[in-house]
């Protein structure tokens, strides 16, 4: 199934939490930090403000950091995604 977000919305897929700390300690269950890093899988066309089209700054494939309490979680074809507004994306990770 393909998903196409509307307006200035973006579909992201969370990246997996780290299994191990830098010092080599294996993390299990609730000890893993919830990731706020994700990969962009779909991007809306942008929005129109006062008759001016606002282009999207992110593109498919970008790795991004997003606000902790934003977006809507959805499940499609057994995969979990989040749909959020571009304004809830804090940075692009290069």
From Swiss-Prot:
PROSITE patterns for this protein: CHAPERONINS_CPN10
InterPro entries hit by this protein: Chaperonin_GroES (IPR020818), Chaperonin_GroES_sf (IPR037124), Chaprnonin_Cpn10_CS (IPR018369), GroES-like_sf (IPR011032)
Pfam families reported for this sequence: Cpn10 (PF00166)
GO cellular component, one term: cytoplasm
GO molecular function terms listed in the Swiss-Prot or TrEMBL record: ATP binding; metal ion binding; protein folding chaperone; protein-folding chaperone binding; unfolded protein binding
Subcellular location: Cytoplasm
Transmembrane segments: none
Keyword DNA repair (UniProt): no
Taxonomic superkingdom: Bacteria
GO biological process assignments: chaperone cofactor-dependent protein refolding
Cystines in this chain: none
Keyword Magnesium assigned: no
Keywords: Chaperone, Cytoplasm
SMART domains: Cpn10
HAMAP family the UniProt entry points to: CH10
Functional summary from the UniProt entry: Together with the chaperonin GroEL, plays an essential role in assisting protein folding. The GroEL-GroES system forms a nano-cage that allows encapsulation of the non-native substrate proteins and provides a physical environment optimized to promote and accelerate protein folding. GroES binds to the apical surface of the GroEL ring, thereby capping the opening of the GroEL channel.
Similarity comment text for this entry: Belongs to the GroES chaperonin family.
Subunit structure: Heptamer of 7 subunits arranged in a ring. Interacts with the chaperonin GroEL.
Name of the protein described by the UniProt record: Co-chaperonin GroES
Organism encoding this protein: Clostridium botulinum (strain Eklund 17B / Type B)
Record lineage: Bacteria, Bacillati, Bacillota, Clostridia, Eubacteriales
